[in-house]
From Swiss-Prot:
Protein's name in the database: 5,10-methenyltetrahydromethanopterin hydrogenase
Lineage per the UniProt record: Archaea, Methanobacteriati, Methanobacteriota, Methanomada group, Methanobacteria
Top-level division of the source organism's lineage: Archaea
GO biological process entries: methanogenesis, from carbon dioxide; one-carbon metabolic process
Pathway where it operates: One-carbon metabolism; methanogenesis from CO(2); 5,10-methylene-5,6,7,8-tetrahydromethanopterin from 5,10-methenyl-5,6,7,8-tetrahydromethanopterin (hydrogen route): step 1/1
Keywords of the record: Methanogenesis, One-carbon metabolism, Oxidoreductase
Catalysed reaction, written as an equation: 5,10-methenyl-5,6,7,8-tetrahydromethanopterin + H2 = 5,10-methylenetetrahydromethanopterin + H(+)
Pfam families the UniProt entry points to: HMD, HMD_N
Enzyme Commission code(s) on record: 1.12.98.2
Function as written in the Swiss-Prot or TrEMBL entry: Catalyzes the reversible reduction of methenyl-H(4)MPT(+) to methylene-H(4)MPT.
């Protein structure tokens, strides 16, 4: 199998968050006895996993940065990073972040510059600056592109070079539905003709070097292609999940924090209403839908930054407390504390 990786990534944004580390990369490095994998990041980590753990025999990375300032920081011994991550990653991560932030001050952002700790060629990858060269005869094309509105212009340069039946994936910078539309405009309806292309996701749900997981979107690829990618993901990432394409963003992107809170609220509310009060599920669903729809309508009407002007958070303290029983009691006390701090 040939894997084409389009976009090598840059560590500066990972360092800037102040919370990421190399836990998964170090785990893989130890599993396969290749310390140089320990400080890979972004698509390079996922490419190394696919090569070493899933048997992908050809990996090509394409990025214009290879003709510019692709910078490899070699201040840290891979073995030291691995040992630190066995105990507490924060024993070494502050020094790594400090160095990255220092280098980032002088280095241009992608595609003119990028920060890495291992060169892809040292992992047995081929490199190129030509996306068309990379995707030629590729079975799996993993994209790691900038913001969604820039992607059609990038993709249209190589879309004619993708072989029929190839799997094409995106990560965190575009929804699957929008990613699919780019290919649909060129190839037509891929849902009923997936042999043309199989469009889905290989979304890590976090920085790949930190967590071993991948999320695969269903809807725009054949069942065979989804299953193939799922099996590769299980072998390479350790944990793989299939989910409807429209849920990928809410589950994997920044709004996952809100999705988690909302979903936990729905599930605990449902159980309190149906199991304790004995109300039918249809009634619980009707009330839940009203809550979600009206809060969304309020946000759309006044803006997320002005919601408190129309609905005082304190207004819920004297009403929601009457539902503080059963499963809802698992989360409501913490919710009340948050609302109390924000009430007018």
């Amino acid at each position: 199998m040939k894997l084409a990786i389009l976009g090598a990534g840059c560590y500066r944004t990972h360092a800037a968050s102040g919370i990421t580390n190399f836990s998964r990369a170090c785990e893989v490095a130890e599993m396969v006895g290749k310390p140089e994998i320990a400080m890979t990041h972004s698509t390079i980590t996922m490419g190394a996993e696919l090569k070493e753990l899933a048997g992908v025999d050809e990996v090509v990375v394409a990025d214009p940065v290879f003709d510019n300032q692709f910078t490899v920081i070699d201040d840290f011994a891979y073995e030291d990073v691995i040992e630190a991550h066995k105990e507490d990653p924060e024993k070494i991560m502050p020094q790594i972040r400090e160095k990255v932030n220092e280098v980032a001050k002088e280095l241009p952002k992608p595609p003119e510059g990028a920060i890495h700790f291992t060169h892809p060629e040292d992992l047995g990858f081929e490199i190129t600056t030509d996306d068309r060269e990379a995707v030629a005869d590729a079975d799996f094309i993993m994209t790691w592109f900038p913001k969604g509105d820039m992607q059609p212009g990038i993709i249209n340069k190589f879309i004619d070079d993708i072989k029929p039946g190839a799997i094409v994936t995106h990560a965190c910078t575009i929804p699957t539905t929008k990613f699919y539309k780019i290919f649909e405009e060129k190839h037509g309806d891929l849902v009923t003709r997936p042999e043309t292309l199989n469009v889905t996701s290989y979304h890590p749900g976090a920085v790949p070097e930190m967590k071993g997981q991948v999320y695969i979107a269903e809807a725009y690829a054949s069942e065979e292609a989804i299953n193939t990618l799922f099996e590769l993901g299980q072998k390479a990432r350790g944990n793989a999940y299939k989910l409807p394409a429209e849920l990928l963003g809410p589950v994997c992107d920044m709004c996952s924090a809100l999705t988690a809170i909302t979903y936990a609220g729905i599930l605990t509310y449902r159980d309190s209403v149906t199991q304790v009060l004995g109300a039918p599920a249809g009634f619980a669903q009707m009330m839940a839908k009203e809550s979600l729809e009206q809060l969304t309508a309020l946000m759309d009407k006044v803006g997320i930054d002005k919601m408190e002007e129309s609905l005082d958070p304190g207004a819920l303290l004297g009403t929601a407390d009457s539902m503080n029983f059963g499963a809802s009691a698992e989360i409501l006390p913490t919710v009340f504390e948050v609302l109390e701090k924000r009430k007018k």
